[in-house]
Amino acid sequence: VLGGDGTILRAAELTHGTDVPLLGVNLGHVGFLAESEREDLHAAVARLAARDYTVEERTVVDVRVHLPDGGEPVRGWALNEATVEKAQRERMIEVVVGVDGRPVSSFGCDGVVTATATGSTAHAFSAGGPVMWPEVDAVLVVPLAAHALFARPLVVGPRSTVTVDVLPRSASSGVLTCDGRRRIDLPNGSRVEVRRSDTPLRLARLSTAPFTDRLVSKFSLPVVGWRERAADVSGRAAERSRATTREEE
């Protein structure tokens, strides 16, 4: 797949539920889901043709929406995240977040992100959620701009079910988006259930480097401590001093 993370997420709609592995070549900006950069395209194609790659399975979440009219649940899925957000910009949405059939917290907010480990570096990350390594089999719950004392991110076990209820008294109705693409309107009184899927998404991998390297590279993280920076500054100052001395001589 040639493109950025959005293009890769669109391609995932075609491969989800199949045994076909997905490999992304980054033509966008961050490209967290991509395995190769554009300058390495020819080498990536050669390795694919030679079947010189490994397959990594990524957790996907299944989503079920119960609407207040009592009809059949609407089903969906997400590789990155399923997000319940307010439908009206000027008003908050009031929700109850629950885990395994038990309410955990109720608050007004802009929304709630329910993410996989893969999605922890996307919308959930920008909302203050933690980064989870891809092999972590868990579901992340991150409130968006919640007006509450207890509205912290939650890391939920793989066998748990997360629910987000849009309260009947909510000033705004809601909208559910899966991976920022597939959208379902949520009238007041709707319930969204999110749980880990039994069908993971398969990604082709060319590199054996740990996820840590990808994290540092994609986010351009400063990995040199102050001691090393201080030593580097001192070294440059000493070099300038020696150069000045040579010029004076």
Which stretches of residues belong to each language-model region?
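Proline-centered loop/turn at the N-terminus of a beta-strand
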Residues: 19-21, 140
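Short glycine-rich anion-binding loops that position phosphate/pyrophosphate groups of nucleotides
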Residues: 4-7, 30, 118-120
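N-terminal glycine-/serine-/threonine-rich phosphate-binding loop
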Residues: 1-18, 42, 46
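A residue-level signal for conserved active-site and pocket-lining positions in enzyme catalytic cores
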Residues: 4, 26, 82, 180
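Gly/Ser/Thr-rich active-site loops/lids in small-molecule metabolic enzymes
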Residues: 102, 106-150
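Catalytic core of DAGKc-family lipid kinases
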Residues: 29-111
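ATP/nucleoside-binding phosphotransfer catalytic cores, i.e., glycine-rich phosphate-binding loops
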Residues: 84, 100-103, 151-249
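Short aromatic-centered micro-motifs
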Residues: 97, 119, 176
